[in-house]
């Protein structure tokens, strides 16, 4: 049986980080019902899509460096390092790209709420594909969204310029296992 971070009132982020399984686990680490709820991740690979949420979120970087890329009008890129706090506005697509290992706590509302995984063309910037979902355990929906994107060349082909993109890289991401564990605990 694999261990994972437990929900508790106090938290040693760095000790709990050692219990994470892969990038973007987003394990809830506060007692159920705490809102906003802190979710812990240790990220080593670029997020495979832009995440769009219906609610505002806050991202706290505890260790490592990276960047948050926004698909706003200016295509803003925000560099993050230890101690940085980034505001992630609702309905603005954002993607985390670590430079090495990046430990982060995401403060988000309690699910379920609507989220979406979105992919944009590297050539022209057009939206290529978007999957919207509402789930108590969004990690399972993330996994299914990437699996669908990777299995359909049409979803990876830009409707504006015709450029076909490679499959989304998952690296050490294990959202399917995280979802199974969280569903098994009622988290």
Which functions belong to the PLM regions below?
Residues 1-42, 46-50, 146-159, 163-187:
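A short, N-terminal "cap"/entry segment at the start of jelly-roll beta-barrel domains
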Residues 52-84:
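A short beta-strand-loop-beta hairpin characteristic of the jelly-roll/cupin
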Residues 122-126, 159-162:
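Cys/His-coordinated zinc-binding microdomains
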Residues 130-133, 167-168:
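Short, non-ligating residues that shape and space the ligands of small metal-coordination modules
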Residues 115-120, 151-154:
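Short metal-coordination and nucleic-acid-contact micro-motifs, chiefly zinc-binding Cys/His arrays
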Residues 80-100:
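Conserved metal-binding segment of the jelly-roll/cupin
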Residues 99-118:
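A short hydrophobic beta-strand segment most commonly corresponding to one strand
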